[in-house]
Amino acid sequence: MKKQQGYAVEVEDLTVAYDAKPVIWDIDLKIPKGQLMAVVGPNGAGKTTLIKAMLGLLKPVAGTVRFLDGSGDIRALKNRIGYVPQSGSVDWDFPATVQDVALMGRYGKLGWIRRPRESDIELTNQALQKVGMREYASRQISRLSGGQQQRVFLARALTQEAEVYFMDEPFKGVDAQTERAIIALLKELKEQGKTVVVVHHDLQTVPDYFDWVTLINLRVIASGPVKDVFHEENLKKTYCGAGALLRIAV
């Protein structure tokens, strides 16, 4: 695939604080188009906060975020940016079927009547098939296991046909089979030229899963190709010398 030019996301001087205490501080970050990127760091480092601030879900104290064509208006780009939140942050008791949830990814592309077209339903069914959830289409989302629910949220992201995807710990709480299915999908999205940003906690799998990584602990410690920045020196800076975390295959 031909390498894309430019950046999917550009962040400058981004700071977010809770009760006057900074959670992320003076973040500068450029994410090239077409990368599969991990955001890693210790608990409380600000990984989820960074994602939410970039998406406009949290209001920063300072800083700017620009997407794709240089626009800072996330609302104008809602059809081009997809988001898969942590499964634990979702109200799974919401009365909706698997197909209903997956179809939500098409809402931004529907007309003012908001009635799904046959093509939307077909695309949704294809996405559910791809994540192995087609046979559960009529089941209530609340009746699924955590791994199955995560697959449905991935199907929703696929139906959106976005250009940039943000995923907050999509592997958390899933079994090995689901994890393999998820990473296969993420790599497929990358091959299609999409940009995928993933909050991730398993350092062991970073070299195999991702080609770009951002190390964060309040600030950005390092960001770049895995082969260049994912090494012991940067990990020590990120995890404050936590030796047990540094025994990784790099």
Predicted regions and their residues:
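Conserved ABC ATPase "signature" region
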Residues: 103, 118-136
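H-loop (His-switch) and adjacent beta-strand-loop-beta switch element
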Residues: 212-226
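H-loop/switch region of ABC-family ATPase nucleotide-binding domains
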Residues: 200-201
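Conserved ABC ATPase signature
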Residues: 140-144, 148
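Helix-to-loop junction immediately C-terminal to a conserved catalytic motif
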Residues: 55
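Conserved ABC transporter NBD signature motif
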Residues: 63-77
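Catalytic Walker B motif of ABC-type/P-loop ATPase nucleotide-binding domains
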Residues: 165-169
